[in-house]
């Protein structure tokens, strides 16, 4: 392998990845780094140097595998574009030639044999995605495009081991880490601050799971919001779930629990949630509002759409009226459509009602 060529390409790619570094007062590109103590930051820099050169061994690190894993995780949180480094390491002690006991970590890499070629392919592939985003679009629209693109283009495979962006962009397969790193990377290439979030999912009863989960938060107009691109995956008919797009800590906390190694910014608002932006949120259930919601959804080719409510009581009112009393069919007619079959699901955790139709006729 031509290591000189690899180093040059990787170095240029690192500049591409970090193009917005230090481009704002909060330095979001190095957010995780800034949460570390001085010794951890030293190891972070050693890991960075090693990754740029694909060097497997880093010496004189922190004591213990967990302490070093915290730093490696922070490095990967700041640098989603380094798809060739894996999120695992091996810690060990060794005796140097002077008889001193020292420690080290071993890093693991993928795609080493053709890394220069893979990096160039990756940069070219990602640049094509950005052709679909207009420079004059606001950040909410740009994040919508990213969320929608990942939800429709990538399949989730819980058995897939690659947690990087490589599998997402080149193989169309990923897990939550790959989805989130891809979202973060694409957002940052648009100049939008975006951070990784680590934690756990809640089940339908609100119990915290035992398997780790990863999602993101992004900044719009000086306010941070949470996003879970994995939970937005499109169904068999291509309908994307935007319930976890641009959410507050309170709303996302109904289904997610943050367990980060370092503090994250607060996400205080749902003002830019998909439901509020598309006027599908109701403090009090009002069936007259459902008609324009149907018209708006169908105009966007969304045959599955979600109504969101202030609390579980209003959700139950909507479910009773629309589905138990079957008023949903008359509302579709008022909106100008005839449907014969309506599927639905309720989520009492986030007070939402999902309505889906497979076929319709215009009246």
Feature locations, PLM:
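Conserved active-site-adjacent core of cysteine acyl-enzyme catalytic domains
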Residues: 113, 161, 170, 174, ...
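A mature extracytoplasmic/lumenal domain signature
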Residues: 109-111, 200, 231, 309-311
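Linear, non-domain "peripheral" regions
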Residues: 21-124, 298-299, 313-321, 326-363
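Gram-positive cell-envelope targeting signals
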Residues: 1-27, 146, 176-178, 182, ...
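Extracytoplasmic/secreted envelope proteins and their assembly/folding machinery
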Residues: 44, 69-72, 119-126, 130, ...
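Hydrophobic/aromatic-rich core segments of domains that either
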Residues: 178-251
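Low-complexity, Gly/Ser/Thr/Pro-rich intrinsically disordered linker/tail segments
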Residues: 242-363
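Secondary-structure boundary elements
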Residues: 109, 113-168
């Amino acid at each position: 392998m031509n290591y000189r060529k690899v180093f040059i390409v990787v170095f240029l790619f690192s500049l591409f990845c970090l193009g917005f570094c230090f481009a704002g007062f909060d330095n979001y590109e190095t957010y995780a780094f800034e949460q570390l103590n001085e010794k951890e930051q030293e190891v972070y820099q050693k890991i960075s140097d090693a990754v740029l050169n694909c060097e497997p061994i880093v010496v004189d690190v922190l004591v213990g595998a967990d302490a070093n894993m915290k730093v490696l995780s922070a490095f990967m949180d700041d640098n989603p574009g380094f798809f060739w480094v894996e999120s695992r390491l091996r810690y060990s002690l060794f005796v140097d030639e002077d008889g001193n006991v020292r420690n080290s970590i071993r890093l693991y890499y993928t795609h080493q044999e053709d890394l220069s070629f893979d990096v160039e392919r990756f940069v070219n592939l990602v640049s094509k995605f950005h052709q679909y985003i207009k420079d004059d679009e606001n950040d909410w629209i740009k994040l919508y495009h990213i969320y929608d693109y990942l939800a429709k283009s990538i399949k989730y495979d819980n058995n897939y081991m690659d947690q990087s962006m490589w599998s997402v962009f080149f193989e169309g397969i990923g897990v939550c880490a790959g989805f989130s790193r891809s979202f973060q990377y694409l957002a940052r290439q648009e100049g939008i601050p975006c951070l990784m979030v680590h934690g756990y999912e809640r089940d339908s009863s609100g119990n915290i799971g035992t398997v780790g989960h990863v999602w993101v938060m992004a900044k719009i107009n000086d306010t941070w919001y949470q996003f879970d691109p994995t939970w937005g995956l499109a169904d068999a008919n291509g309908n994307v779930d935007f319930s976890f797009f641009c959410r507050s800590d309170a709303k996302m906390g109904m289904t997610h629990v943050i367990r980060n190694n370092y503090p994250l910014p607060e996400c205080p608002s749902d003002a830019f949630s998909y439901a509020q932006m598309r006027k599908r949120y109701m403090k009090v259930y009002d069936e007259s509002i459902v008609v324009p919601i149907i018209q708006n959804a169908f105009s966007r080719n969304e045959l599955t759409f979600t109504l969101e409510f202030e609390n579980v009581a209003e959700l139950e009112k909507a479910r009773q009226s629309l589905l138990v009393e079957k008023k949903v069919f008359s509302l579709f007619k008022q909106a100008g459509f005839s449907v014969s079959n309506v599927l639905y699901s309720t989520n009492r955790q986030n007070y939402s009602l999902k309505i889906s139709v497979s076929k319709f006729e215009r009246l």
